[in-house]
Amino acid sequence: MNAKTLPFDDSIEAETWHVPLFIRGRLTLQRVLSGMGGWKLDPKDVPLIIRLVENPKYDIGLFAGNVSLFSHDCIHVLLGRGLLTKDEAFVIGFTMGSTKKMFRWRKNLFMFCAKYLYPECYRFGEEERLVFNIALEAGKRCSADLSKFDFKKYKNYSLDGLRSKLKIDKNFLRHCYEFEKKCFPKSVESQRLI
């Protein structure tokens, strides 16, 4: 990555793609999403077990916070997260927490699925489980249920404007990310957060 390349430009590989939470400038949601290059996941490429757990088309009432892949990508951007496993754990946890419907039995069932049923590269280990739990609590502070929000109507909003509309508190997220960074000093995704 050269000095002029942003960490979310389309020349960046998926493993290093992320949107810093405190990036300067007036970036729109659409601008950042367009930086997800040719590696962007197609909905049909998502493993079936993940679709059953996380996709609203397969909602069987077991889990809260099911969102489309587009909405999921938007939430990655708004939370300043990349695409690695701890990033996924935070985005999923925050989304589920925002519903205010993630009761203990749902959380435990999701954790079982994420630890034992997800394909290996998507599985949550103990570190990801902690990140998920932090995010679940952080998501409860969000005034909007992100699983019900129509992100397509807000593609041209600035990131800060959309965070403000959804009452996503960047300073609270900073505290969550500082804690995560201290907990996982060898984790690439945790170290690049702040």
Where are these regions (language model features)?
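Core of folded catalytic or high-affinity ligand/protein-binding domains
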Residues: T5-D160
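Long, solvent-exposed, polar/charged low-complexity segments
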Residues: A138-I194
